[in-house]
Amino acid sequence: MSENIAKRYVKALIEVCKKDELNDVLKGLKAIVSAFSVAKFNDIIKSPTVSKKDKISLILSFLKEPNVKIENLLKILMKNGRISLLPQIYDGIKESIALSNNEYQGKIYTKENLDEPTIKLLETNFSKKLNANIKFVCIAGNYTGVKIDISDLGYEISFSIDRLKSAMSEYILKAI
């Protein structure tokens, strides 16, 4: 439910801001959103004893140059008790800008981290193939094989070593 509410604010910001203004808003929100990972900050924001004006002042203190659009957004969110939606609004704006620039984020799941040249090679090849600018993040885990996921475009490619072994065993048994 909160995602739908955040999408409304994102849509409103996109309609109100020009492209360069939207980038400035995104930079400002990035500084603010990073504070939401600090427990003390969340305690202050949720505290009923701290006035809304003081909360807005605290949030604006994270910005080097306060933006009128950000200030108005903060006032509206604070008035409606939805200041906790800021991280989701930030993600929505970031995603919208990326989509308008034809940029997509992908994930590579492997057992070990891939080196930077390999990731760059994959980014280049997928960017050419999909006619978009693709950036990958490597996530090391217990995945035996390689899985590439570009969820925004609906692409998922996986190669499992276990599956290869079973297919080879099956093929050898059929050949005998």
Curated annotation (Swiss-Prot):
Taken from the UniProt entry, a GO cellular component term is: plasma membrane
- Write the record's keywords in alphabetical order, separated by commas: ATP synthesis, Cell inner membrane, Cell membrane, CF(1), Hydrogen ion transport, Ion transport, Membrane, Transport
Q: Which domain of life is it from?
A: Bacteria
SUPFAM superfamilies, A to Z: N-terminal domain of the delta subunit of the F1F0-ATP synthase
Any Pfam family from its record, for instance, is OSCP
Q: Does the keyword Transport apply?
A: yes
Membrane topology value: Peripheral membrane protein
| Gene Ontology MF annotations | proton-transporting ATP synthase activity, rotational mechanism
UniProt-annotated location(s): Cell inner membrane
Q: Which InterPro entries match?
A: ATP_synth_OSCP/delta_N_sf, ATPase_OSCP/dsu
Q: What does this protein do?
A: F(1)F(0) ATP synthase produces ATP from ADP in the presence of a proton or sodium gradient. F-type ATPases consist of two structural domains, F(1) containing the extramembraneous catalytic core and F(0) containing the membrane proton channel, linked together by a central stalk and a peripheral stalk. During catalysis, ATP synthesis in the catalytic domain of F(1) is coupled via a rotary mechanism of the central stalk subunits to proton translocation.
Family of this protein: Belongs to the ATPase delta chain family.
Q: How does it assemble?
A: F-type ATPases have 2 components, F(1) - the catalytic core - and F(0) - the membrane proton channel. F(1) has five subunits: alpha(3), beta(3), gamma(1), delta(1), epsilon(1). F(0) has three main subunits: a(1), b(2) and c(10-14). The alpha and beta chains form an alternating ring which encloses part of the gamma chain. F(1) is attached to F(0) by a central stalk formed by the gamma and epsilon chains, while a peripheral stalk is formed by the delta and b chains.
Question: What is the recorded name of this protein?
Answer: ATP synthase subunit delta
Provenance organism: Campylobacter hominis (strain ATCC BAA-381 / DSM 21671 / CCUG 45161 / LMG 19568 / NCTC 13146 / CH001A)
